[in-house]
From Swiss-Prot:
Protein's name according to its UniProt entry: Ribosomal RNA small subunit methyltransferase H
Task performed by this protein: Specifically methylates the N4 position of cytidine in position 1402 (C1402) of 16S rRNA.
Matching HAMAP family: 16SrRNA_methyltr_H (MF_01007)
Entries under InterPro entries matching the protein: RsmH (IPR002903), SAM-dep_MeTrfase_MraW_recog (IPR023397), SAM-dependent_MTases_sf (IPR029063)
Keywords, in A-Z order: Cytoplasm, Methyltransferase, rRNA processing, S-adenosyl-L-methionine, Transferase
Length: 311
């Protein structure tokens, strides 16, 4: 199966995982297995890579790509937020590193019938896991106007959220919005012409917001980080790639809280709560793609990598 996906910040991720040849590593967002194949190459027969993805196509494609190294790889179709249960089922007590590449993959964007992209006309879907019930079509056609406004404003950081939500609700009174290009047309009508001249595609932020809502992307990040860190062996690292400011802010704050968990009032001269740091932050500032990488893969432009190490 052809699963086209260019791995972002590949060398930087591999370097920061500090891979030990006999270690156990998790790629929580398997995708096209670009990161996974490089991790697996560095493992001995005693090492193990666990590749997780909720996308059935990703699992199938990765299985084919990783066949030469299959003895040191286990693939799991699940959401990385279930890392605790996944490791328990595999009877694994601790891991030496975990990588999360958040957001939608290049393959999912390019696979027109998945409905992730505003560039292709397709059924409104946007489900990363096609087994789940709620799709973008349900969100767009059944959520209240206020709920749509909040989603588009909070998850898309879209200044025209109120107008877009209003236009969506008005349109669906006449007929349901069932395709991506229908939704794009509604969004374009909602945003004043002058505001559409500069900047990204007018539908970009709204599509991002709806995708995040459909897949519960932001809700699971904090829980996943806590669970992942708890399962890391001392010295093990967690590497997370984000693609927009909402994700990056959550990761940054989660790492900060885990590295400085003191809950004492600020007026206390010394810590009395005795809460110990769980990690040390490796990247005080996020790692971003080089100009060379951006020339090869413009979609990497907004990527940021943050790394923390279990104490």
């Amino acid at each position: 199966m052809d699963f086209k996906h260019v791995s972002v910040l590949l060398e930087e991720c591999i370097e920061n995982l500090n891979i030990k040849e006999n270690g156990i590593y998790v790629d929580g967002t398997l995708g096209g297995a670009g990161h996974s194949s490089e991790i697996a190459k560095r493992l001995s027969d005693k090492g193990l890579l666990i590749g997780i993805d909720q996308d059935e196509n990703a699992i199938k494609a990765a299985g084919e790509k990783l066949t030469p190294m299959k003895e040191r790889i286990k693939l799991v179709r699940d959401n990385f937020s279930n890392i605790d249960a996944i490791l328990q089922n595999l009877e694994i007590d601790g891991i030496d590193g975990i990588l999360l590449d958040l957001g939608v993959s290049s393959h999912q964007l390019d696979e027109a019938d998945r409905g992730f992209s505003y560039m292709h006309d397709a059924p409104l879907d946007m489900r990363m896991d096609t087994r789940q019930a709620v799709s973008a079509m349900e969100v767009v056609n059944s959520y209240t106007e206020k709920d749509l406004e909040n989603i588009i404003k909070n998850y898309g950081e879209e200044k025209w959220a109120k107008r877009i939500a209003n236009f969506i609700v008005d349109f669906r009174k006449e007929e349901p919005i069932t395709t991506t290009h229908q939704l794009v047309d509604v969004i374009k009508r909602a945003i004043p012409k002058g505001a559409r001249i500069d900047g990204p595609h007018p539908a970009k932020r709204t599509f991002q917001a709806i995708r995040i809502e459909v897949n519960g992307e932001l809700e699971i990040i904090n829980k996943t980080i806590d669970d992942a860190v708890r399962n890391l062996n001392p010295g093990g690292r967690i590497c997370i790639i984000t693609f927009h400011s909402l994700e990056d802010r959550i990761v940054k704050n989660a790492f900060r809280d885990l590295s400085n968990p003191c809950i004492c009032p600020p007026e206390f001269p010394i810590c009395r709560c005795d809460r110990k740091p769980a990690v040390k932050i490796i990247t005080r500032k996020p790692i971003v793609p080089t100009e060379e990488e951006l020339e090869l893969n413009p979609r990497a432009r907004s990527a940021k990598l943050r790394v923390a190490e279990k104490i």
